Each structure stands twice: as structure tokens, then as C-alpha cells.
């Protein structure tokens, strides 16, 4: 048997194998003999059909069986002898198997790249300086009050103002022809919120109950109905009712509706604590992504396409799960599976690169995980909930593979922490960070 191993790229090898004719003949004979024993052909007792008839009837089955055995006995033996570890099923190309002729085939095998970390300390990155803005808490409280507002009918001869909630009938027409898909009755609109068309809402200001008017607008190119998107047309609007929002008072009674709070000050304190933690977590996650990207840029690495494909499919499934939990679909987001795959391919490639580089760093620095660190991770995941803590422990001790996944996650966090501790970090103000983005 002749074997040739060729390196195609850092992540792929081509294995070419030629099996001599005498070995091919031997396997063909043995296979036909086996088929002859079990073949059931009309007019012949089992095992008594002539060999020539067996060959004519079962030639394709013979070829499939012989080639399968050759792959099993020669390909995997060759891979083992040359210490080639495939990370996906090999892609095989072969000649036609014929008696009296050597059988040649080749297998393209994807392998893990050799990861050489040339620079992983002194990585230069930026970090957003956290600055607490109390106004964000007040803005959130204002949104909470707005969400609990009561709608009170406006009495008397009153015209629509910004902020009013109005009930309207409207019908849209283009060039005098009605578009039923862009019409509604008793639609509720918050004037000035611009949840519909700003140009449309602004022209409602000044209308009074019972009044009708024409409102001319140009629909945006991205309008939900493609048949009228980008066209100029007219709405015939009839105003049925005007209501105003009556906000609840900002007092202790208001605060008590949001959990175990006795006063507005307690509510503010908890919201401030949550906001600060949320912002710090966000900055930490951004730092993590930034330092991994810096690691990728300093350590170029080819990655197997099969790993990228798996990462893309995982990202697609994660998105579908999130959309399903919100009763949404890919179509509602204006995309399909293929367009999403194309959109995330580059980021999926970087995720694979980053993962391989972190694995190499973990091995190089010999990071380990203690039982105490595992317990701390359990507690972090439980968030102080004792019942949840027990369920988490039960889950991660249910099998060695599940426990291993947690240990791998902790090791990866340690590797990222190592990168950050040894990086050159320049702090920037939030405004500068936003401008760079």
C-alpha cells in the first residue's frame, strides 16, 4: 500500500492512498463469496446462485462494501500512524473500484492548527471609565411613572397637543386609490412619541374631536408594506377622542408597588445599585471582547471551516431561541437563515480564533481550578438563592462532561483575567468611547 500525506494548509491535510491490485482482487473475491452465501435469487436455493449471476446482480453492493472496508482498514490506520487527528468527517474522493486495478483514493482532513502564542502580554486596549449619572435613574423613574399613567378623557373644546393620546380612524390612498392595508379604525396614537410616522403624528396637533382632515406624508423606503413604501400619499384622518396621561405621584406609595420598598429613597438606592452593577458588567464584558480581539490581532491564526460552520449554526439557533421566547421570527427581523449566516460569519470566525488562542494560553500558563473556585462559581450563578444553588450543584455534578464544561469556563475566565492583568490599558471617558464606536 502506498501512502502520501500532503499539508494543504495549517488546518487541512490531504491523505492519498493506493491499494495494490492483488489486495483489491482478494477483497472483491471475499466479498462476492459472502454475498453469494446470503443472496436470495429466484430460481436458486440460498448460496447456490452462480457466481457470474451474483456479480451481475450485486456489483454495486460489492463496490460499496469493499470501499467501506478499505476506508476503515487503511484510512484510519494511516491517520493514526501519522498522528493526524481529524476534527470532522474526512472528504473522500476515489477512483472506480475495478478488479485487476489498484484502488486509489484521497481524503481531505481538517485538523486543529498549531497555535503559537507569540504575544499575549502587553496588549494595548482601551477601557471606558465608569461615571455614574444620577439623571439616568430619574429618567428610568419617569418611564416607570409613564408606564403606570392613567388615561383621562379631555373634556371641552380642546385641541390636540404633544403628549396627548388620541383615538383616530385613518385611511391611506396613493394617487387617489385607497390602500386598505394601510388603514385602521379606532387606532390609539401617542402624539409626539413617533411610534408611527413623525410626519403623520405632527400634523395631528391642533385637531379637535369630530374633526377630519387630509394629512400628506411620504412613506419611508423601509415601510412594512413594500407596495406603498417610498410613495407619497394622503391620510384621511378623523379624530374620535382625546385623552391625556395622568401620572402617579412620586411618593412612597408609588415605590411600594415595585417590591419590598417602603420609600422612594429605597427604590432609588436599589435602582442605583442595579444600574451601577449593570454598567460595570457591561464595561467588563466589553473589556473581555476587546482584549480577546487584541490577542487575535497579535496572533494570526487559520481556523478550520468546520468549526466556523458549527459556531455559525450555534449562533443561529441561539437567535431563534431568543426570538421564539418573544413570539418573534426571523422573517419579522427582515432576514432568513442564509442571510444571518452570511452576516455573522466573520464574527463566528473570530469566536473560534479567540477560543483556540485562549485554550493555548490556558495550556501554556497551566491554569488549574480548585474545588473552592467551583463552589464560588456555583454561588455566583445562584445569585444568593439557596434553592437555586442546590439545583445548580445537582446539574453540574450530574455527569463528568457537564462538570468539565464548567471547569473549562472558569479556566477561560482566568485566561481573560490574565490577559487584562498584563495588558496596557488606557481609560477613556464614555463620550470618547461612544465617538469611537
Curated annotation (Swiss-Prot):
PPIase FKBP-type domain mapped to chain residues: 163-248
Subcellular location per the Swiss-Prot or TrEMBL entry: Cytoplasm
Main location: cytoplasm
GO biological process: 'de novo' cotranslational protein folding; cell division; chaperone-mediated protein folding; protein transport; protein unfolding
Family: Belongs to the FKBP-type PPIase family. Tig subfamily.
PANTHER family: TRIGGER FACTOR CHAPERONE AND PEPTIDYL-PROLYL CIS/TRANS ISOMERASE, TRIGGER FACTOR-LIKE PROTEIN TIG, CHLOROPLASTIC
Name of the molecule in the record: Trigger factor
Species of provenance: Pelobacter propionicus (strain DSM 2379 / NBRC 103807 / OttBd1)
Source taxonomy: Bacteria, Pseudomonadati, Thermodesulfobacteriota, Desulfuromonadia, Desulfuromonadales
